[in-house]
A protein has these predicted regions:
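Non-catalytic accessory regions used for complex assembly or targeting
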Residues: 5-36, 161-174
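Long, low-complexity, charged/polar intrinsically disordered regions in eukaryotic proteins
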Residues: 19-87
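Extracellular-facing segments of soluble proteins and assemblies that are Gly/Ser/Thr-biased and enriched
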Residues: 112-114, 135, 151
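A short, conserved structural fragment
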Residues: 133-144
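Short acidic, hydrophobic short linear motifs in intrinsically disordered regions
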Residues: 87-120
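Short amphipathic alpha-helical interaction segments
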Residues: 119-134
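Short, cationic-aromatic polyanion-contact patches
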Residues: 144-172
Length: 174
């Protein structure tokens, strides 16, 4: 019986480590090359991740599978009983605005975006804004001490190492 529980813990830990690694790699790729392909990889990797709007409302999003087995380019925000959809075109529009903001900045600098509407009058922007913050595309709070982008990657890496170490010691007896 103990072996079965250990296997489940190890399997769960491995899945979590793989998910964290996928998120880390997606963010690193996006920050190295701000392309729509890398943005989409981040969107896919972070689905189901607990997020908060600027006003503090919790939400997460999922991507649904299309007719031919691929993911649809529509984010389904799960905040209440009814889900709200955000189209890929809305995400792209906001992303293009971020890229325009970056043009006037020095290399590696992120645009400071005080409020979601500063990215444009785009449907679903209050849900897109925290995503861009989480991915490290924008700076939303100068006093945040870097809890996004590369810093998030490092935190995810640290968490996966910790989870791996925990999973390896849970089966040991003292």
């Amino acid at each position: 019986m103990q072996c079965m529980n250990w296997n489940k813990l190890t399997e769960k830990g491995s899945v979590e480590v793989m998910e964290q690694e996928e998120k880390r790699k997606a963010v690193e790729a996006l920050l190295a090359d701000c392309s729509e392909e890398h943005l989409w990889a981040c969107i896919v990797a972070f689905q189901g991740e607990p997020l908060r709007t600027m006003s503090g409302l919790p939400y997460s999003y999922t991507l649904k599978e299309g007719k031919h087995g691929g993911l649809t380019k529509e984010l389904w925000v799960d905040r209440r009983e009814n889900s709200k959809s955000i189209t890929w075109s809305s995400v792209r529009m906001a992303f293009q605005n971020v890229l325009k903001m970056k043009e006037s900045l020095s290399e590696g600098e992120k645009p400071y975006v005080k409020r979601p509407k500063a990215l444009g009058d785009i449907r679903g922007i209050s849900y897109i804004y925290p995503l861009f913050d989480r991915f490290g595309l924008i700076e939303t709070d100068p006093d945040k001490n870097g809890k996004n982008g590369i810093q998030l990657c490092l935190q995810l890496e640290e968490a996966s190492v910790h989870n791996e170490a925990e999973a390896n010691t849970e089966g040991e007896t003292t």
